[in-house]
């Protein structure tokens, strides 16, 4: 008799995706982040659900409802900090996953890659609206500053901002709709993740060499399930260490002050995972220019497959491209640091140079160096 997992309509889908899936035999731990992102998503949905049971999306009670969760709800503080730090772990995994895709040429699976970029944008939107919910000072002013950027859009900008706000300033209507968005978006992310997997399983996984591995596949279970469980344990350990020892390490102290429209914080800045984009936004003195640069800093990922000039898919055997890749990582870390600094000398010029380098590396240097490496292959 055939095993039920191979015949049952629903079990068959799961079997083909997680058990009998043919997987390259040589993929490294960098391929672990896909499943870790799935774990993060499940964790965020569950902790978020329990938080939503006690949270009230109203300007007069939002801040105190979060305090109530932390003080009066059983393990409320734990759920709240798991959710807040879980978002940070989510972005760490997300950036590692994208970095892996860039390094090993996974972007050549264009459908999978484009859905991935869409997923990144959706996760960023979810994190942004979620940060507004505790209704602290940074929540309020972050929402005001970032939504106000839309007013830079010619002709319809101001109308658009007031439409998103639901009034003439960030207020009760804004908070209510942001809570609604924050609740619905994770389910959209789940659906997109399923499509992401669907497209991936059409082509099969890439591997570190970038060479087709159809002749050397092994079943996903047990070989990679066991490796994924190890990765998951590391992730959970890191998350628990962060949550139980230094829960506020990545947060902003200003968010422990209730939102006050009459007092602006000295330095308005988003969470750490948005700082690189925020630095690019601030490095351009023009409002519309800054908004376009901000958008392009993320959307540039869509153009990566079109900028592929190398004959080799992976960077594994391309030392010059590797050097540029790690320069890009260093540049992004520099931008992240600059995004958290005040707008004054020398941070302004460093941010501008780092922003120029970011686009120059991706659009000019990497494709050019790939062409040079192609020439070197003929020597």
Swiss-Prot record:
SUPFAM superfamilies: a domain/subunit of cytochrome bc1 complex (Ubiquinol-cytochrome c reductase) (SSF81648), Transmembrane di-heme cytochromes (SSF81342)
GO molecular function: metal ion binding; ubiquinol-cytochrome-c reductase activity
Localisation per UniProt entry: Mitochondrion inner membrane
Cofactor: heme b
InterPro entries in UniProt: Cyt_b/b6_C, Cyt_b/b6_C_sf, Cyt_b/b6_N, Cytb/b6-like_sf, Cytochrome_b, Cytochrome_b_C_euk/bac, Cytochrome_b_N_euk/bac, Di-haem_cyt_TM
Superkingdom, natural source: Eukaryota
Residues given in the record as heme b b566 binding sites: 97, 196
Additional note from the record: Heme 1 (or BL or b562) is low-potential and absorbs at about 562 nm, and heme 2 (or BH or b566) is high-potential and absorbs at about 566 nm.
Subunit structure: The cytochrome bc1 complex contains 11 subunits: 3 respiratory subunits (MT-CYB, CYC1 and UQCRFS1), 2 core proteins (UQCRC1 and UQCRC2) and 6 low-molecular weight proteins (UQCRH/QCR6, UQCRB/QCR7, UQCRQ/QCR8, UQCR10/QCR9, UQCR11/QCR10 and a cleavage product of UQCRFS1). This cytochrome bc1 complex then forms a dimer.
Described function: Component of the ubiquinol-cytochrome c reductase complex (complex III or cytochrome b-c1 complex) that is part of the mitochondrial respiratory chain. The b-c1 complex mediates electron transfer from ubiquinol to cytochrome c. Contributes to the generation of a proton gradient across the mitochondrial membrane that is then used for ATP synthesis.
Protein name: Cytochrome b
Organism: Lissodelphis borealis
Gene: MT-CYB
């Amino acid at each position: 008799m055939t095993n039920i997992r191979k015949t049952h309509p629903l079990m068959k889908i799961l079997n083909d995706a997680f058990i009998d899936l043919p997987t390259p035999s040589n993929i490294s731990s960098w391929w672990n982040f896909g499943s870790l992102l799935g774990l993060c998503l499940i964790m965020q949905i569950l902790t978020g659900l329990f938080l939503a049971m006690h949270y009230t999306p109203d300007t007069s009670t939002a801040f105190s409802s979060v305090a109530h969760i932390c003080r009066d709800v059983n393990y409320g503080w734990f759920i709240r900090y798991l959710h807040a730090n879980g978002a940070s772990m989510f972005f760490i995994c997300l950036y590692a996953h994208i970095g892996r895709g860039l390094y090993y040429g996974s972007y050549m699976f264009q459908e999978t890659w484009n859905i991935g970029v869409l997923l990144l944008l959706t996760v960023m939107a979810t994190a942004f609206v979620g940060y507004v919910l505790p209704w602290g000072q940074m929540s309020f002013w972050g929402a005001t500053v970032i939504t106000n950027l839309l007013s830079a859009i010619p002709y319809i900008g101001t109308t658009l901002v007031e439409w998103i706000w639901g009034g003439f300033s960030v207020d009760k209507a804004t908070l209510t709709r942001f809570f609604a968005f924050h609740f619905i978006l994770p389910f959209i992310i789940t659906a997109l993740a399923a499509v992401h997997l669907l497209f991936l399983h059409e082509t099969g996984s890439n591997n570190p060499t970038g060479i087709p591995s159809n002749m050397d596949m092994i079943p996903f279970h047990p070989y990679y399930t066991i490796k994924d469980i190890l990765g998951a344990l590391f992730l959970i350990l890191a998350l628990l260490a962060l949550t139980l020892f230094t829960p506020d390490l990545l947060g902003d102290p200003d968010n422990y002050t209730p939102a006050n429209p009459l007092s602006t914080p000295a330095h308005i800045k988003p969470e750490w995972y948005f700082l690189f984009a925020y630095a690019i936004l601030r490095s351009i003195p023009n409002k519309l220019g800054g908004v376009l640069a901000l958008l392009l800093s993320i959307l540039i990922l869509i153009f990566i497959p079109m900028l592929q000039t190398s004959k080799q898919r992976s960077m594994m055997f391309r030392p010059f491209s590797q050097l540029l890749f790690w320069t890009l990582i260093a540049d992004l870390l520099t931008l992240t640091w600059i995004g958290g600094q005040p707008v004054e000398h020398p941070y302004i010029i460093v941010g501008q140079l780092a922003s120029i380098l970011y686009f120059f590396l991706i659009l000019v240097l990497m494709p050019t160096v790939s062409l040079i490496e192609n020439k070197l292959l003929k020597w």
